[in-house]
A protein has these predicted regions:
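N-terminal leader/propeptide and maturation segments of large enzyme subunits in energy/redox metabolism
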Residues: 59-105
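Phosphate-interacting basic helix/loop segments used at nucleotide- and nucleic-acid interfaces
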Residues: 107-127
């Protein structure tokens, strides 16, 4: 299954901030950025992983205070996916949906989000993100849902996601599914399985781990 990421951004154009970054493209802004940078700095002395071993200090500081909010968000995602979390879990940890006072979520899903909240403080937008790493490509929204994010799935296994439906011309007869990604929601494709996941399917998958 193929995919296309298309994000429109208003950041002043410089090559070092060109999107997509290493694993993520981001439309919007991170209003909690200063707090997220401070929290990550506080966590850094405890960050360790066998993948990096003694070279873990080469990664620090994890977040560059001179980088854009989008570049900082990408760096946070990259840290998580390089240390054994896949993209759907990284999104659920870093940009979770609103969950604490919702009666429509299962206790198991709430427990998962409580775990995520214990690992890292949430990043709040408005933010729409698309990302790709390993077996997964994702497209998701922060819990505020104030940025447009739509998707199209075609009969030749192409997923297109971005801020506008008409960003790429697709014959209507080839579209088998289309819609919008709502506040806190996430859609994804697993390359290995060649499968498209809707938000409720990902929640079920992640909460069973």
């Amino acid at each position: 299954m193929g995919s296309e990421m298309c994000i429109r951004d208003s950041t002043f154009p410089t090559w070092s901030l060109a999107q997509p970054f290493r694993v993520l493209a981001h439309n919007g802004e991170i209003n909690t950025l200063k707090g997220n940078i401070n929290w990550m700095s506080a966590h850094e002395p405890r960050i360790t992983h066998s993948f990096f071993n003694e070279r873990i200090n080469d990664l620090k500081p994890i977040l560059d205070p001179d980088a854009s909010d989008s570049a900082s968000l990408d760096a946070a995602f990259e840290l998580f996916v390089q240390t054994d979390r896949d993209m759907p879990m990284a999104k659920s940890m870093i940009i979770p949906e609103s969950w604490s006072n919702r009666s429509d979520l299962s206790d198991r899903l709430k427990a998962m989000y409580a775990y995520c909240n214990a690992v890292i403080e949430p990043w709040d937008g408005p933010a729409a993100v698309c990302g790709n790493f390993g077996d997964w490509i994702i497209s998701g929204m922060d819990r505020n849902g104030l940025r447009p994010l739509r998707y199209i799935l075609t009969d030749d296994d192409l997923l297109i996601s971005g801020s506008e439906v008409g960003m790429i011309n697709i014959d209507e007869k080839n579209i088998i599914k289309k819609g919008r990604v709502g506040p806190g929601e996430l859609i994804a494709v697993n390359y290995k399985e060649n499968k498209f996941y809707e938000s409720f399917e990902l929640k079920e998958l992640l909460s069973k781990r």
